[in-house]
């Protein structure tokens, strides 16, 4: 799981630090330290992945000129030398240095986007300079961010202290009349704001990436978790600790010792109450697997046996419910771990959903039509869509939801709604997860707002309590986790207040951070902004307004009047008619989509639609692609839908794409529209959550806009789903249904007007808890039938376990009765499996790919070839490092097709990657023209060197993978224990070898055929694991030295002890085998000599 580490320090001259030295170290660069007239060189330091030096938008001209035309490290060098020169005091504070852990769950590109977002909103927005670097250490990606402590003035730097400005815009004065000052940057309050801002942005980007994770930056104490916080050990402390371990001594560091004490205390607390681990996990994730439990335990538990014991104890905890059993991914054959949640989490969300439904059915908080009309007159520029949304939230229900994209007019709508509520006598307040969002709600909509955490704290202290005259607006509701959302819904229920949730459709994904908002919005319905403008016909826009207001019957009447509703007697006939019309209307220049509510309908419609295109020759049979739901065939021209977020490809759940190139388990598709149109390359081994996209579920279509839509109505639809399905189109919509089934249920209008779809129940389980668990699973995108089956299987397993307990109890009772002489217990003998003499190594510190990746960097041939490549870069480009980064070498390594395209681009347009060395034209000097000539001559050579490097890298990778897999297979072999008879023979053989009586040794070994076979099997295992003659050398006389260290590499302490004990036995075995080989060779040689003597010689 991601680590919540965010620390700050001040780079102070008084503590012997220099901001230029710090910058050079972080940028892994060579810099001139002008104050001391010396050069600092950290170019040998590794781990730098990305670097940026960024100025605020209103930065003065002098600082822009200072860093102009410099590299990132060059800009950093120039700026911080300027700071060093400006600060005159011997104890001057030069900069603030932030160290921030990045989440492993996000890719490097996603982490860079996260940091840029944070820097823009919380550093540059305050006028600070941001100098940051991304260090990609294995398992510990992090950034170092240095910021200024003084504002930038027109000529240089401003004062570190600034006057405190009051609400009237004037400086605040003390009682004596003096102006009150505060630090411009670097104070504790400033740090707290930055820390809160970081965790808010972090959780936002985790949610956008589809990561089921929420990071809480508060201390364990404030979170209510009974654990001691561990201490962050810096680079120096960790280096000392490693060196001490290499020498076999304990590191004498106070921080290390204190950290170990806290880890031991936490281990004790977890042993006493393993449920603490569940508290930790469920604060970050609502659905988890065994790996999540292991990640938490690894922080505190080192002993393997204790670790395994606690793993079992936690997973079998009565509070844990298994939602999905361990399965195999059909498309890849990979193991998918079992998924779990806690009963408390499921009950919490179920209670929240019930309370939200209850609030939606309670009336009495509405605004009169008169007040609404007065508001609309004052805001004449409100769109019909915004008016419909205002009517929705100002309705009588005590809960409402609004979904709209950023910039869609939500704030304008909320401002007008606030005025309407205030006219009706209500008090309107607001809240948001982030302080920035709360501030925006207050400034732009005029709604008194705080952060959600601030509201919770004030209510806890009995201040600013809600009442039946309060309207509470929650902005960015999609980012609020289930537990916090449940608390606010419960508060609204108890206080008699009304709560309005405002969110973004991009946050309506089945992830923890947005699951609460989605769960509520799905149940109570919502108004959607940026919907009505989709439709081009006026009557369609009016119908969409009716749908938004819940007047489904009026909307259906409009579509029926314009011959857009087709009813057939049976549903199957309606499907046939839909496909026929779709085939007739299909136009590759238009976007067309079929919508249905049920997944089985979607699958059927996709198959039928594609068959029509194949018949017409518009797409071919296609190439096989193993998707997560089974095999599909894709060809150029196919329409597809992506079913899972993937940040590295820029894909969103429900996004529509069109295939342009198809091959087995690989496609190239276009996504987006207009200027946003782009191509993505999808490899099955990396991403397989896609399907044909001619038809998709209504839920997947949320937020989508297409030209034409065909809707298959089913009895499972309700008012909210109908609203979504019938507002996705621009040009045309056609609805199809089976008249017979709908007539049995009151007709089309009645079914499609229902406030809530009928809940799914299972014939084999009617308990309330199971229904809640299924709803919980469905909200998070888990397959409901799979979850249901898992719960039933687990119920059966529980019954069988109880039976086993009863059987065990009966046996114990029988044993007790036998002890009293009541009956005689039959005697049984069990055979215990013999432990191996030396156990094989079954677990490894890293995966094969990790080990291969590490070794690639040390391969001599690759290093030499890369030196050639880097030298060519220096010949060709004016700034080789920047050009190298622009080439996107990671993509070049990952995909051969991408590599081919990049290298072709390099050869054809080298200037598109970076400025070439030298210059041309009449103003260029002779050396500059010569440098340009050399650069152009070296472009083809650079391409050849890169191609050679890629070929060599692929060859070396395959060799290293084979070597590592062979090594792992070899060291995993168990050396079997010898039977008592074999041990006796072994001792006799050993004595004979010591007496140098090898014939006697062989005689002892051959004395018993079964024993000889056992010893041969033992020798075979030793040979396969350690090598044929490894233990025959003089270096193998004793289990010590380099040979012993080599053979025991990767072993646990107990395995090393086993090896020491087995060493003389294995050495004796190899000596015996060696002597047998010698005797056999001599025998063969003698037989050959005799044969040669007996061969007759023919005389001529």
Swiss-Prot record:
Binding positions (ATP): 404-411
InterPro entries (alphabetical): (+)RNA_virus_helicase_core_dom, Bep_BID, Coronavir_polyprotein_1ab, MobA_MobL, P-loop_NTPase, TraA_Ti
NCBIfam families attached to this UniProt entry: PRK13826.1 (NF010402), TraA_Ti (TIGR02768)
Keyword ATP-binding part of the UniProt annotation: yes
Gene3D superfamilies membership: 2.30.30.940, 3.30.930.30, P-loop containing nucleotide triphosphate hydrolases
Native organism taxonomy: Bacteria, Pseudomonadati, Pseudomonadota, Alphaproteobacteria, Hyphomicrobiales
MF terms in GO: ATP binding; DNA helicase activity
Protein name (record): Conjugal transfer protein TraA
Keywords, ordered alphabetically: ATP-binding, Conjugation, Nucleotide-binding, Plasmid
């Amino acid at each position: 799981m991601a680590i919540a580490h965010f620390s700050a320090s001040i780079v102070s001259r008084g503590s012997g630090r220099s901001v230029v030295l710090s910058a050079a170290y972080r940028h892994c660069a060579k810099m001139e330290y002008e104050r001391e007239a010396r050069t600092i060189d950290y170019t040998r330091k590794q781990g730098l992945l990305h670097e940026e030096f960024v100025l605020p938008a209103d930065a003065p001209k002098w600082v822009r000129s200072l860093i102009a035309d410099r590299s990132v490290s060059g800009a950093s060098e120039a700026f911080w030398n300027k700071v060093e020169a400006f600060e005159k005091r011997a104890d001057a504070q030069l900069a603030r240095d932030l160290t921030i852990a990045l989440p492993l769950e996000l890719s490097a590109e996603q982490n860079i986007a996260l940091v840029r977002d944070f820097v823009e909103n919380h550093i540059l927005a305050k006028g600070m300079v941001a100098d940051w670097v991304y260090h990609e250490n294995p398992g510990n990606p992090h950034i170092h961010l240095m910021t200024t402590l003084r504002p930038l003035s027109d000529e240089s730097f401003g004062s570190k202290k600034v006057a405190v400005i009051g609400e009237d815009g004037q400086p605040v004065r003390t009682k004596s009349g003096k102006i009150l000052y505060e630090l411009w940057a670097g104070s504790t309050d400033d740090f707290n704001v930055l820390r809160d801002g970081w965790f808010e942005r972090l959780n936002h980007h985790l949610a956008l990436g589809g990561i089921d994770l929420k990071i809480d930056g508060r201390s364990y104490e404030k979170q209510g978790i009974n654990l001691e916080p561990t201490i962050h050990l810096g680079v120096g402390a960790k280096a000392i600790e490693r060196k001490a371990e290499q020498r076999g001594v304990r590191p004498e560091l106070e921080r290390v010792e204190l950290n170990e004490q806290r880890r031991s205390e936490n281990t004790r607390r977890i042993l006493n109450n393993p449920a603490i681990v569940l508290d930790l996990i469920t604060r970050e994730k609502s659905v988890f697997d065994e790996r999540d439990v292991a990640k938490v335990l690894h922080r505190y538990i080192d002993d393997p046996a204790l670790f395994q014991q606690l793993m079992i104890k936690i997973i079998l905890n009565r509070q844990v419910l298994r939602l999905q059993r361990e399965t195999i991914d059909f498309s890849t054959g990979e193991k998918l771990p079992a998924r779990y949640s806690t009963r408390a989490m499921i009950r919490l969300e179920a209670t929240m959903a019930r309370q939200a439904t209850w609030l939606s059915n309670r009336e009495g908080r509405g605004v009169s039509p008169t007040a609404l009309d007065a508001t609309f007159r004052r805001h004449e520029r409100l769109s019909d869509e915004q008016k419909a949304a205002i009517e929705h939230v100002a309705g009588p229900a005590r809960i409402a939801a609004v979904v709209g994209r950023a910039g869609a007019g939500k704030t304008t709508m909320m401002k007008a709604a606030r005025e309407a509520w205030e006219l009706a006598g209500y008090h309107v307040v607001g809240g948001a997860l982030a302080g920035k969002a709360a501030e925006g709600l207050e400034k732009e909509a005029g709604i008194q707002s705080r952060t959600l955490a601030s509201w919770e704290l004030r209510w806890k202290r009995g201040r600013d309590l809600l009442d039946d005259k309060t309207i509470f607006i929650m902005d960015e509701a999609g980012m609020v986790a289930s537990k916090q959302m449940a608390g606010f819904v419960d508060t609204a229920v108890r206080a008699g207040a009304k709560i309005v949730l405002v969110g973004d459709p991009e946050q309506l994904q089945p992830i923890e951070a947005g699951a609460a908002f989605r769960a509520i919005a799905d149940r109570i319905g919502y108004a959607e902004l940026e919907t009505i403008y989709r439709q081009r016909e006026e009557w369609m826009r009016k119908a969409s307004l009716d749908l938004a207001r819940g007047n489904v019957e009026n909307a259906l009447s409009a579509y029926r009047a314009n011959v857009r509703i087709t009813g057939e007697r049976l549903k199957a006939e309606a499907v046939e008619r839909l496909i026929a019309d779709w085939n007739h209307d299909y136009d590759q220049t238009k976007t067309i989509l079929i919508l249905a509510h049920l997944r089985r309908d979607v699958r059927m419609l996709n198959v039928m639609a594609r068959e029509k295109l194949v018949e017409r020759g518009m797409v071919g049979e296609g190439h096989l692609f193993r998707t997560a739901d089974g095999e599909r065939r894709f060809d150029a021209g196919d329409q597809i839908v992506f079913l899972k977020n993937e940040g590295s490809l820029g894909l969103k759940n429900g996004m529509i794409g069109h295939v342009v190139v198809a091959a087995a388990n690989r496609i190239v598709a276009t996504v987006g529209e207009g200027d946003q149109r782009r191509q993505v390359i999808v490899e099955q081994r990396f991403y397989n959550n896609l399907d044909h996209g001619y038809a998709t579920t209504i839920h997947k279509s949320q937020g989508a806009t297409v030209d034409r839509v065909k809707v298959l109505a089913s009895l499972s639809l309700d008012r909210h789903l109908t609203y979504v399905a019938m507002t996705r189109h621009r040009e045309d919509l056609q609805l199809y249904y089976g008249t017979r089934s709908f007539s049995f249920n009151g007709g089309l209008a009645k079914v499609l007007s229902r406030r809530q779809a009928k809940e799914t129940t299972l014939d084999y389980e009617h308990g309330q808890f199971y229904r809640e668990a299924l709803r919980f699973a469905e909200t998070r995108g888990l397959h409901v039938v799979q979850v249901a089956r898992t719960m039933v299987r687990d119920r059966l397993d529980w019954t069988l376990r109880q039976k086993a307990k009863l059987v065990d109890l009966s046996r114990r009772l029988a044993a007790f009765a036998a002890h009293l002489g009541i009956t005689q217990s039959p005697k049984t003998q069990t055979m215990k499996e013999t432990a191996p003499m030396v156990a094989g190594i079954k677990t490894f510190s890293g995966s094969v790919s990790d080990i291969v990746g590490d070794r690639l960097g040390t391969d001599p041939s690759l290093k030499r070839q890369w030196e050639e490549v880097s030298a060519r870069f220096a010949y060709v480009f004016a700034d080789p490092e920047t050009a190298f980064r622009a080439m996107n070498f990671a993509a070049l390594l990952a995909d051969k097709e991408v590599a081919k395209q990049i290298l072709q681009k390099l050869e054809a347009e080298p200037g598109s990657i970076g400025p070439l060395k030298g210059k041309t034209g009449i103003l260029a000097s002779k050396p500059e023209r010569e440098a340009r000539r050399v650069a152009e001559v070296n472009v083809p050579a650079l391409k050849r060197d890169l191609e050679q490097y890629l070929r060599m890298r692929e060859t070396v990778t395959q060799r290293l993978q084979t070597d590592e897999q062979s090594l792992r297979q070899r060291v995993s072999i168990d050396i079997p224990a010898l039977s008592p008879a074999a041990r006796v023979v072994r001792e006799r053989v050993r004595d004979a070898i010591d007496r140098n009586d090898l014939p006697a040794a062989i005689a002892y070994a051959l004395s018993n055929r079964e024993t000889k076979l056992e010893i041969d099997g033992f020798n075979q295992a030793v040979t396969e694991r350690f090598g044929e003659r490894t233990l025959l050398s003089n270096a193998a006389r004793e289990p010590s030295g380099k040979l012993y260290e080599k053979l025991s590499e990767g072993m646990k302490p107990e395995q090393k002890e086993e090896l020491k004990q087995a060493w003389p036995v294995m050495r004796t075995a190899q000596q015996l085998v060696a002597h047998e080989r010698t005797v056999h060779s001599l025998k063969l040689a003698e037989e050959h000599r005799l044969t040669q003597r007996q061969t007759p010689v023919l005389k001529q």
